[in-house]
């Protein structure tokens, strides 16, 4: 972040930096970012080879920094949003959920692979290198899962997968929440449901535990 933060802020942009560890978070804050996207190892995409789950990483970072935090990695509904807020986040990022949305420009084959995935149907790749990756399980990614070779060259044909629908052409970056997504739905419907679930969860928790305050 040291290279670009000042330039971006001078151009009037708000800068949130994605961080996979406490050390990265502290470095980003020192560089003057406006906020952090704290992403646990559950998330899809480019990862820290030494991945840390959101339930550990998010409250750890929150305890050490004062900037706004967007939680990423494992968040897709009102319940997980409420959990993120309880752990110190101000917002959530739902990457895999939005990749699977009706308006997403990626090929239907990728969306359907997310919908049909179990919670164990992602693989962690490239751990011996940097960045590591979390992707949906296919024949290709299953072969690459324990490879010590750098797999970044596989993205040379990414458009054949992303927009052409050939799931074996490249690597489909996908988070573990794929196992909880059961349909391709419009974004507006997803957001409305997340909001409704969030307030239901908060209301239920308040009613269940408010009385304990006076014990």
Residue ranges and their predicted role:
Residues 48-70, 76-212:
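Conserved active-site-proximal phosphate/metal-binding subdomains
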């Amino acid at each position: 972040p040291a290279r670009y933060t000042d330039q971006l802020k001078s151009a009037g942009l708000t800068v949130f930096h994605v961080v996979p560890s406490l050390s990265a978070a502290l470095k980003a804050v020192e560089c003057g970012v406006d906020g952090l996207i704290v992403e646990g190892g559950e998330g899809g995409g480019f990862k820290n080879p030494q991945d840390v789950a959101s339930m550990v990483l998010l409250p750890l970072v929150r305890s050490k920094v004062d900037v706004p935090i967007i939680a990423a990695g494992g968040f897709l509904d009102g319940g997980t949003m409420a959990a993120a807020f309880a752990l110190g986040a101000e917002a959530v990022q739902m990457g895999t959920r939005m990749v699977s949305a009706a308006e997403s420009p990626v090929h239907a084959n990728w969306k359907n692979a997310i919908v049909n995935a179990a919670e164990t149907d992602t693989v962690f790749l490239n751990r011996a290198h940097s960045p590591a990756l979390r992707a949906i399980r296919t024949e290709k990614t299953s072969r690459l899962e324990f490879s010590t070779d750098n797999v970044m060259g596989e993205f040379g044909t990414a458009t054949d997968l992303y927009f052409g629908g050939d799931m074996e052409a490249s690597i489909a970056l996908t988070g573990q929440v794929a196992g909880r997504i059961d349909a391709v739905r419009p974004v507006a419907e997803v957001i409305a449901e997340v909001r409704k679930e969030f307030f239901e969860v908060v209301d239920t928790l308040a009613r269940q535990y408010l009385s304990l305050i006076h014990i």
